[in-house]
């Protein structure tokens, strides 16, 4: 039977998050219902409230970085049992489409419906207000909800000793930031790297660049404590402006500039991208 619990949702945009009582459906085939233990807070969640990121269904439950414990499993659903610890991925991976089959699960066909708020294969949701109104789930998850019924395509089982309050961040900020340096940026040993914006994603980009062996990691952020944190995480330099970073990079590369430039600014504008090529 459905579970009554609380969520934090936006009724329209621009708007504010508010607490609401919701009904969470039983899981169907290839779905699980999870008791949320921890959720991250991503800048994308704020973009939902401001309207910078439009969505297809209002009200809309926020949150896409989360981890919890499986409370129930849908019929004929394989790979999960009640009590399993899971971490959510904001990008689903079906394992069947062309992209998943060729090792590019970040491009899974299911990702096209991330912000619709509904299921991948029909216009319904698994979350409703008490009057029956459908509530959209961010990335098909909605980790700001105490319980969430989600497709198994969005859940990864993790070891029993996993600390979920830490692991919840793996679903977006770690994968996005680390991946921007290691996978997309393809940072190599000895490279000079500039990273603009040291929030959750930028901080992980710093760590990814350091792990990949970059000789010089230049973090750019106007906020002092973020620059300090970047250096704690391995950045060799931390400056306030892209102009400063560019001059430092040129000094290491005989005037050529950075080998890799990563933009992880919360609200990215064309000039930020242009500066990355300077």
Question: Predicted segment positions?
Answer:
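Cytochrome P450 core scaffold surrounding the K-helix E-X-X-R motif
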Residues: 43-50
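Mid-domain Rossmann-like dinucleotide-binding core that forms the NAD(H)/NADP(H) cofactor-binding site
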Residues: 85, 146-147, 153-155, 159-247, ...
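Cysteine-cluster motifs in flexible loop/terminal segments that predominantly coordinate metals
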Residues: 90-153
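Short Gly/Pro-enriched turn/cap motifs at secondary-structure boundaries
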Residues: 23-24, 57-63, 136-140, 146-147
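Short amphipathic alpha-helix with an adjacent loop that forms part of the alpha/beta core around
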Residues: 245-255
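Short SAM/SAH-binding signature in class I
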Residues: 256-262
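Glycine-rich phosphate-binding loop and adjacent beta-alpha segment
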Residues: 214, 265-278
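Glycine-rich beta-strand-centered segment in the early N-terminal region that forms part
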Residues: 25-39, 52-101, 106, 114, ...
């Amino acid at each position: 039977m459905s579970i009554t619990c609380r969520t934090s949702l936006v009724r329209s945009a621009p708007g504010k998050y508010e607490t609401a009582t919701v009904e969470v459906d039983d899981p169907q085939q290839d779905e699980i219902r999870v008791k949320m233990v921890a959720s991250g807070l991503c800048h994308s969640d704020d973009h939902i409230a401001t309207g910078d990121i439009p969505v297809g269904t209002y009200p809309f439950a926020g949150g896409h970085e989360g981890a919890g414990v499986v409370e129930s499993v849908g019929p004929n659903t394989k790979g999960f049992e009640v009590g399993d610890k899971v971490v959510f991925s904001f990008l689903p991976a079906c394992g069947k489409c062309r992209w998943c089959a060729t090792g590019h699960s970040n491009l899974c066909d299911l990702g096209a419906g991330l912000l619709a708020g509904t299921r991948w294969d029909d216009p319904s949701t698994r979350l409703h207000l008490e009057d029956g109104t459908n509530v959209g789930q961010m990335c098909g998850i909605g980790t700001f909800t105490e319980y969430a019924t989600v497709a198994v395509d969005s859940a990864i089982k993790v070891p029993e000793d996993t600390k979920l309050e830490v692991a919840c961040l793996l679903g977006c900020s770690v994968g996005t930031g680390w991946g921007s340096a290691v996978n997309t940026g393809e940072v190599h040993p000895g490279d000079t790297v500039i990273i603009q914006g040291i929030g959750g994603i930028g901080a992980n980009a710093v760590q990814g660049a350091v792990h990949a062996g970059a000789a010089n990691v230049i973090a750019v952020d106007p906020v002092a404590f973020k620059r300090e944190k970047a250096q704690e995480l391995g950045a060799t330099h931390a400056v306030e402006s892209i102009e400063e970073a560019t001059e430092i990079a040129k000094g290491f590369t005989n005037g050529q500039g950075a080998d890799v430039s990563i933009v992880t600014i919360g609200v990215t504008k064309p000039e930020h991208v242009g500066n990355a090529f300077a």
